[in-house]
Amino acid sequence: MKTLRVAKTLLVLAFASFSSFSFAADQVYTIGVQDYEHYLPYSHYENEVYSGLGRDILDLFAKKKGYVFKYEAYPIKRLNWLYLGGKVDFRFPDNPYWVANQKKGLDIKYAPLLKFADGVLVSPKNLGKGVGGLKRLGMPLGYTPYAYLDLVKEGKITLYENPSYLGLYDQVWSGKIDGAYANIRVAKYYWRKIKGVEALPVVYDPGLPHVSDFHHIGSFKHKDIIDEIDAFMKDESNKAAIEELKRSYKFDPND
């Protein structure tokens, strides 16, 4: 009889452990992210470690909800394929307008996290020359310069991809390209916050076409969690913690 009771106890403990493991496993989600170095304050990927303001905000949400987010970094084109193929649970950053033709048929839900602005960086001596001064336009590998696609189709602009933001800056500064279509805040952050340079070797030209929007987190697999993230970002009780994270990265939404 004692042996039977022990066996029953072990069975109950085993079931409880399995149930706890299953529950814990259900709370782990993969977020596909881009593998850019020097993309701060938004993100930075180096030595297989993904960091930055975007991750800190998402981890703050996850901790509050009892989730665990696992970040998997890929080049943008591969990230698109994995995300749209359902190989990762979420994508960050995402945006309803990005690769919209590839998203047809997918009911993707989005929650906005951080403002961004993409525009053209030029050498200070070329500031104000207008679109006519852009013949060779660089961009990060995997980017789509939506504001310039018509000019590219007309043959007025030739695109050059670079896997490195630092490589783009060098190409602009050396005159190998006329401008670089990139995230404006990222460029300012690198030169001012990391390099400590006030007289920037590459500058944003506001007279050229540019785009402003939000970096969203997107998913078609877990739309309920997207709703939770959206509510989290709007909840006044979370505002102080989120603003503190932004201050730690010197992230000014009006910059």
Which sequence ranges carry the predicted segments?
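Extended ligand-binding regions for polar small-molecule ligands
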Residues: R55-K64, K125-Y143, D213-Y249, P253
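Acidic, polar ligand-binding/catalytic clefts
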Residues: Y71-L134, L141, P145, V202-L208
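Bilobed "Venus flytrap"/periplasmic-binding protein-like clamshell domains
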Residues: E48-L60, V120-K156, Y160, S164, ...
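A local structural motif
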Residues: K63-E72, L151-P163, K176-I177, A199-V202
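Periplasmic-binding protein-like
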Residues: D35-E37, L113-G119, K195-M233, D252-D255
